[in-house]
Amino acid sequence: MWARAVHLGLRAAARGRRGFTSKADPQGSGRVTGELIQHLERLSLVDFGSQEAVARLEKAIAFADRLRAVNTDGVEPMESVLEDRCLYLRSDNVVEGSCAEELLQNSHRVVEEYFVAPPGNISWSKLDEKQPFSHR
């Protein structure tokens, strides 16, 4: 019951917001600078080393600019794309247990009983060549 009240309160608060603020160029020049690429690579750990990757990024930015231009005044935000029906959660029944060791054997790398995945589209070999991240 309380979760529904909190959800409705958050939804009402979200209606009052007109949009998000961003440091991005509001006109959407569409050009991606070297400085921006370095910043995005640092944030996302995705390598934009090829012209094809940069072109794909510029295309995604242009698409986002087109979406930003859509007039959504007076449009109620949706809770779900399936608002016309009830979505019930299934019961969570554990069928097997104590199989963590078996599952972790499927991973390329494991650290302290956790899967370690390569970030973004940077392969393990490229990561091994780079300096480790400094934790500040």
From Swiss-Prot:
Cystine bridges: none
Primary location class: mitochondrion
Protein location: Mitochondrion
UniProt signal peptide: none
Transit peptide as recorded in UniProt: 1-27
UniProt superkingdom: Eukaryota
Pfam families: GatC
Biological process terms in GO annotation: glutaminyl-tRNAGln biosynthesis via transamidation; mitochondrial translation; regulation of translational fidelity
Principal EC category: ligase
Keywords from the UniProt entry: ATP-binding, Ligase, Mitochondrion, Nucleotide-binding, Protein biosynthesis, Transit peptide
Subunit and interaction comment: Subunit of the heterotrimeric GatCAB amidotransferase (AdT) complex, composed of A (QRSL1), B (GATB) and C (GATC) subunits.
Stated name of the protein: Glutamyl-tRNA(Gln) amidotransferase subunit C, mitochondrial
Organism: Bos taurus (Bovine)
